[in-house]
From Swiss-Prot:
Function comment: Aquaporins facilitate the transport of water and small neutral solutes across cell membranes.
Tissues expressing this chain: Expressed in roots, leaves and anthers.
Subcellular location: Membrane
Name of the protein in its database record: Aquaporin SIP1-1
Alphabetic keyword roster: Membrane, Repeat, Transmembrane, Transmembrane helix, Transport
Motif (NPA 2): 192-194
GO cellular component, one term: membrane
Principal localisation: membrane
């Protein structure tokens, strides 16, 4: 069990490193694509490009996570699937989670530091990660609500949504972009404590109460509440009784 937990944590660290490295380029990639296509008017065109790029990224990372045995780049996703009773048996205990959360945070730090060095100078102003733009409690409430909504959407799309993986990925991308736009004036937003911690570390804000309260406690509360709501509406099937041996 300990070996499997360490392997899962290592896979999470690697995937989170790559996720933060790649997803941080979405703004620059959208700007580059719209410039290449000479699309300078209408924000809806830029949003379409962003959703398309995010869909490709999510599809690729879903394949990568599956290949690594269920790796994840978002601590709230692990907590939500655990609370909803949807975790696999080997990932359902608390010990693996206790290893995977800090591993994801460490991977995010590495990804944020790497992209800060690799990003071309003309696009570096697009980096920086989520940051609080309102008072502390308003930001905390916003992060809780946003994480609740995205978690509920993710659970429904993955468990009860369409079977086609491309359609699922497109729906996840649209949901994510809509909530990012909604929360932009509040917290950034993050909806992913590891990603928020990575950028907070780069900007030397990782050891503050704001980081812990707004970007860790409240997203976890929102994710677990969403999981409980999902479990109440869509209860998992009862385990089949084992056949007694004659």
């Amino acid at each position: 069990m300990a070996v499997a937990a360490v392997r899962a944590a290592a896979a999470d660290a690697a995937v989170t490193f790559l996720w933060v490295l790649c997803v941080s380029t979405l703004g620059a990639s959208t700007a580059a694509v719209t410039s290449y296509l000479r699309i300078h008017e209408g924000i809806h065109y830029a949003l379409l490009v962003t959703v398309s790029l995010l869909s490709v990224l999510l599809f690729a990372f879903n394949l990568l996570c599956d290949a690594l045995g269920g790796a994840s780049f978002n601590p709230t996703a692990l907590a939500a699937f655990h609370a909803a009773g949807l975790s696999s048996p080997r990932h359902s205990s608390l010990f693996p989670l206790a290893l995977r959360f800090p591993a994801q945070a460490a991977g995010a730090v590495g990804g944020a530091m790497a992209i800060s060095e690799l990003m071309p100078e003309q696009y570096k102003h697009m980096l920086g990660g989520p940051s609080l733009k309102v008072d502390l409690h308003t930001g905390a409430a916003a992060e809780l609500v946003l994480t609740f909504v995205i978690t509920l959407a993710v659970l429904w799309i993955i468990v009860k949504g369409p079977r086609n993986p491309i359609v699922k990925t497109w729906m996840l991308s649209i949901s994510t972009v809509c909530l990012v736009l909604t929360g932009a004036a509040y917290t950034g937003p993050s909806m992913n404590p590891a990603n928020a911690f990575g950028w907070a570390y780069v900007n030397n804000r990782h050891n503050t109460w704001e980081q812990f309260y707004v970007y860790w406690i409240c997203p976890f509360v929102g994710a677990v509440l969403a999981a409980w709501v999902f479990r109440a509406v869509f209860p998992p099937p009862a385990p089949k009784p084992k056949a007694k041996k004659a």
